[in-house]
């Protein structure tokens, strides 16, 4: 959207590339977020093809994803800070006419082994924009920040969201470990459409679970607003995965399972069944116990790890 806005400001014509209809183009941009997304395999009729995005910067080395920052050119300042051209998504993304997308901060101080944010955007959450850079009164705002609560400017930035009066979707997982009563109270003043947190590491149990209780007590939010990313297949055991999921359910929060290195897991594995059960809200809220989820109970993997899960 920003590239489109910048090119149009230079007098260029911008359109989605359609091989059968576009004809010859001067320049075509291609991007992808994830390394497992297949690349475009057909001929591109253009003088120049520019590829960008995290998906082109990640390699799997000895079973571990490695991010190559030197491959990530990023956007020039004048492009990064231009008001986005939302019109290119009209008819393609639901309610795009009434929704603003952007980020107020970049970076995260955590440096988690399973995440590329620290390498890509720095081990510090820092302000990169005010809300007015990508929002001009739309009724909805989708935020793509990685760790806004770690930014030293969190308070004025949250105040901007409060003052907007717009419905806000915190699409990135907020760091619940950084929640204080003051932060929870300010979050509670925002017109939340959806808010995402993360419970990635079982090792954080003693720190993070009291924070989730504080969020519940001060906001009263439930499953319709709160979704919590739960990382599995990294360092946790099946028992620890279920323990985190059941805890979140006890607060009426919706857990959402994210499988690390999913491409190298088997279809009938524990984590695949867990993801299907947990991420289907109808199944999750109607089947209280994972062991009562019939496809899992009938699987060979169930018999193999039943004793470990229930010990």
Locations of regions flagged by a protein language model:
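Canonical Radical SAM [4Fe-4S] cluster-binding loop centered on the CxxxCxxC motif
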Residues: 1, 94-132
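A short, structured N-terminal alpha-helical element that caps or precedes a catalytic domain
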Residues: 1-51, 56-58
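A general structural detector for well-ordered alpha-helical segments in enzyme core domains, enriched
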Residues: 3, 39-45, 157, 182-186, ...
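Anion (oxyanion) recognition and catalysis
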Residues: 8, 162, 246-250
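Short, charged, surface-exposed secondary-structure boundary motifs
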Residues: 26-28, 40, 58-75, 113, ...
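Core AdoMet radical
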Residues: 29-33, 116-211, 223-234, 254-258
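Ser/Thr/Gly-rich flexible loops in soluble cytosolic domains mediating phosphotransfer, phosphorylation
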Residues: 49-90
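A structural motif corresponding to the C-terminal lobe/cap of the Radical SAM core domain
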Residues: 189, 194-196, 203-311
């Amino acid at each position: 959207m920003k590239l489109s806005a910048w090119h149009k400001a230079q007098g260029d014509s911008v359109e989605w590339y359609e091989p059968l209809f576009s004809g010859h183009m001067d320049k075509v941009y291609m991007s992808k977020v994830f390394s497992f997304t297949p690349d475009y395999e057909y001929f591109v009729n253009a003088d120049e093809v520019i590829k960008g995005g995290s998906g082109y910067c990640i390699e799997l080395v000895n079973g571990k994803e490695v991010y190559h920052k030197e491959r990530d050119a990023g956007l020039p300042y004048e492009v990064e800070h231009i008001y986005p051209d939302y019109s290119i998504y009209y008819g393609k993304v639901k309610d795009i006419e009434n929704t603003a997308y952007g980020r107020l901060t970049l970076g995260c101080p955590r440096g988690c082994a399973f995440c590329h944010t620290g390498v890509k955007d720095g081990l510090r959450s820092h302000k990169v924009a005010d809300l007015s850079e990508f929002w001009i009164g739309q009724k909805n705002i989708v935020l793509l920040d990685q760790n806004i609560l770690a930014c030293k400017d969190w308070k004025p930035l949250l105040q901007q969201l409060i003052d907007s009066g717009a419905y806000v979707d915190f699409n990135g997982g907020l760091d619940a470990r950084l929640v204080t009563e003051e932060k929870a109270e300010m979050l509670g003043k925002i017109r939340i459409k959806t808010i995402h947190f993360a419970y990635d590491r079982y090792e954080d149990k003693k720190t993070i679970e009291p924070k989730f209780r504080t969020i519940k007590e001060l906001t009263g939010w439930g499953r319709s607003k709160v979704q919590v990313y739960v990382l599995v297949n990294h360092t946790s055991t099946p028992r620890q995965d279920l323990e985190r999921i059941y805890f979140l359910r006890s607060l009426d929060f919706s857990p959402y399972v994210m499988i690390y290195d999913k491409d190298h897991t088997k279809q009938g594995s524990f984590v695949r069944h867990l993801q299907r059960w947990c991420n289907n809200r109808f199944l999750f809220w109607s089947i209280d116990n994972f062991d009562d989820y019939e496809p899992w109970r009938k699987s060979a993997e169930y018999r193999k790890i039943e004793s470990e899960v229930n010990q």
